[in-house]
């Protein structure tokens, strides 16, 4: 006579286990959706910052202008270009580096550098050929990088890459 009781307790246990597993799966799915939404929001912020510099006429004007002497160029870079580009790091602590790499060999602090510095990087070929924002993750170096070709410089005959390195652990 104990057989039906055991069978019903086994059935009840199975149903309870199934209910708890379903609840756990829904909870994990919800947590994952929240995480994805958070990361998407963070990436959107960095994309907007990339757009801000990439399509900034002042930035492209300074980099494409035909200066009469080095001092004039240096003055524009220090007084106007640097503050614009560096402001991204000041307002977003999780940004490690913002650099515009260009093909004219100019180097200034961390904001401006020659393309040759990144020609051997994994992201270079796709970035130099696309004005879309491309994201790259290097798990070994713990780097999260946004890189894209700057169309505003391309129209002036200059190859330029907008590069943002974000703190890997902040995402």
What kind of region is each of these model predictions?
Residues 9-10, 14:
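Membrane-embedded alpha-helical segments of multi-pass transporters/permeases
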Residues 1-8:
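Short, small-residue-biased leader/transition segments that mark boundaries at the very start
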Residues 19, 23-31, 100, 132-136, ...:
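N-terminal sensory and localization modules of signal-transduction and trafficking proteins
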Residues 118-119, 140-171:
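Conserved beta-strands of PAS-like sensory domains
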Residues 26-132:
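Extracytoplasmic/periplasmic sensory segments of membrane signal-transduction proteins
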Residues 102-104, 138, 152:
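Acidic surface patches and DE-rich sequence motifs
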């Amino acid at each position: 006579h104990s057989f039906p009781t055991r069978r019903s307790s086994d059935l009840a246990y199975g149903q309870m286990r199934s209910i708890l597993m379903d609840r756990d799966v829904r909870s994990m799915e919800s947590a994952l959706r929240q995480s994805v939404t958070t990361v998407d929001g963070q990436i959107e912020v960095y994309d907007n910052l990339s757009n801000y510099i990439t399509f900034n006429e002042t930035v492209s004007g300074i980099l494409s202008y035909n200066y009469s002497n080095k001092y004039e160029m240096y003055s524009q870079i220090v007084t106007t270009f640097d503050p614009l580009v560096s402001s991204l790091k000041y307002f977003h602590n999780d940004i490690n580096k913002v650099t515009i790499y260009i093909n004219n060999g100019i180097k200034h602090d961390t904001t401006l550098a020659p393309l040759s510095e990144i020609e051997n990087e994994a992201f270079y070929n796709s970035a130099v050929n696309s004005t879309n924002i491309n994201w790259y993750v290097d798990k070994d170096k713990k780097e999260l990088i946004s890189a894209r070709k700057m169309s505003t410089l391309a129209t002036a005959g200059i190859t330029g890459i907008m590069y943002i390195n974000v703190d890997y652990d902040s995402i």
